[in-house]
Amino acid sequence: MAIKESKPTMPYWHVYVDEDGISRQERFELSAFELKGISPKVEPQWNDKMEPSKAGVTFTVLPLGWVGEWHENPKPQWIAILTGRWFVETMDGMRVEMGPGELMMGEDQGTRGSKGHRSGTVGDQPCTMIVTALDVTPTVGQPGRFK
C-alpha cells in the first residue's frame, strides 16, 4: 500500500533554561520524520528517531490535587500525557496546561533562583503519564533543539 500523505509533524512543549538560568517553555514541532518500515516485511510508517542514548522509563500517576513545588526535572526527559491534565509553570511566569496525547521535553536542569518549574494536576482526575528519562547532558539556551 502506497502512503500518499504529506510528511507529518508532532507538537511538543520544551521546558528549557536560557542563558540567564531562567526556565522557559515554548511549543515546537518534531519534523524529521522518515517513511520507512521497521523491518523489511513491515509496511512503511513515519518515524522521527532521536539520537541513541540510555533511557529509563517510569509510568507515573499524579494524584488528584497533587502539586510539585519548584523543582527541576532530574534529567532531560520526554513526558507523554496519557489521561487527565496537568500544568507546568516556568520561572518566566508562563503556565501551560497539557492533556492526553500532549508531549513535553523537560530540560530545566541548572536554573538559578527559583528552581526549575512548578507542576500539578488540573481538574477532577489524576494525571497518568509515561516519562522517558534520557542519559544525556542537558543544554542551555537551545530551545526547540529536538527536530
Where are these regions (language model features)?
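Short acidic, Pro/Gly- and aromatic-enriched capping/linker segments at domain boundaries
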Residues: 2-17
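A short glycine-rich, His/Asp/Glu-containing loop-to-beta-strand
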Residues: 17-70, 76, 126-127, 132-135
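Short beta-strand segments in beta-sandwich/barrel cores
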Residues: 68, 85-89, 103
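Glycine- and acidic-residue-biased ligand/ion/polar-headgroup-sensing regions
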Residues: 74-92
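A short hydrophobic beta-strand segment most commonly corresponding to one strand
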Residues: 105-109, 117-139
